């Protein structure tokens, strides 16, 4: 690192100041493009400024000193004994009774490394302790500043430094350090995952697959509470929203329990859809609801929208086509003590809208009470939910309700467009046959992949779309409205309430 700065021909200290002479500023910023090409040397952070040199150097130094041995490169089967390494650390000897006071004074120069004790016993003197110091900050006794030397003198501690051979083992390295040392140089390292109870859910790339079992073992070893690591082997199934997975390490048991926003959910992760990255979104929708509101959850999964809404004293109708999701939805309603507040259905989304949703809307929107609850419809099936909006066209008969009582839809979707908000609005407009330009909002949920966003478009269903007579009078030139299949029952699919059975 020092060589890099020397090659560029100016002092590292230049970047450590917050203000510099104009001539120095010109030199600094002409070097920015070149410095950005030097890995781990120069960073432009999200603060839109220059990262301070202490931050950069600390990271580089740490990776140099505490990197695993080079001969683990290419390891396919984890051998923990191969990670042994000895490093030389400067230490300061002090009487054990003054160690606590001394440590407070030496925070600047003490060794900062998770999993390594900064104070150890002196093998040659049981009444003394050895304080481990930062090997880059503490080269000699002259490296102490004036205040630190004053404390040493006050406590009668000699500033003389000694060297201690510290043995590092597999347990002392972080997961990203291990994987960076093992995987081929220059390739992306997977150290993150989605946690689903005791399960670490990884989504490995092709170049990481030869090391998949080692990666899974490292994830289990380095993350307390994780006892199983799995990798997705196929895309999400569009029918039931689950995916094929391979157990990389640990137990095969996929029955798990998670806590999200103070609610508990239990399910078989191999058979249902669950995404812990949607926790904030589940909470956001819940915040939009008021006690007494009505929520229709068209693709309810195991209940992350339905259950919080029910606990907020909303009337909830929750549906999912997947029989496993339906089973665990019933179970979780009971588990969270809202089984009497949620009506659960196991139907196709279109049938659910044309059946239970239609029947309830006809009933509720036709009431004459002055204070009517708001109606919300959540459609969390990003790959296909936009298509289901067509079911709302000419869904209701009779006299239209007032505008403020029209149901509010929260529809999730994906976009790869450069203007994703505009894109999803246009998609929804194309399906509904009306403009949503001034009557909708689009919320960015999360980035799914490079150039792929997940969004939620929220809007009230226009009267011209929702009511049959309005649709016919305003859109005679469009396709005939969808007709609900007639059955002997008011709607196909009976609601179920969670029970002991």
Curated annotation (Swiss-Prot):
Its EC number is 2.1.1.228. S-adenosyl-L-methionine binds at residues 282, 320-321, 348-349, 380. GO terms for molecular function: tRNA (guanine(37)-N1)-methyltransferase activity. It holds the Pfam family TRM5-TYW2_MTfase. Keywords: Cytoplasm, Methyltransferase, Mitochondrion, Nucleus, S-adenosyl-L-methionine, Transferase, tRNA processing. GO terms for cellular component: mitochondrial matrix; nucleus. Residues 474-501 are annotated as: Disordered. Coiled coil: none annotated. It catalyses: guanosine(37) in tRNA + S-adenosyl-L-methionine = N(1)-methylguanosine(37) in tRNA + S-adenosyl-L-homocysteine + H(+). Belongs to the class I-like SAM-binding methyltransferase superfamily. TRM5/TYW2 family. Involved in mitochondrial tRNA methylation. Specifically methylates the N1 position of guanosine-37 in various tRNAs. Methylation is not dependent on the nature of the nucleoside 5' of the target nucleoside. This is the first step in the biosynthesis of wybutosine (yW), a modified base adjacent to the anticodon of tRNAs and required for accurate decoding. This is tRNA (guanine(37)-N(1))-methyltransferase.
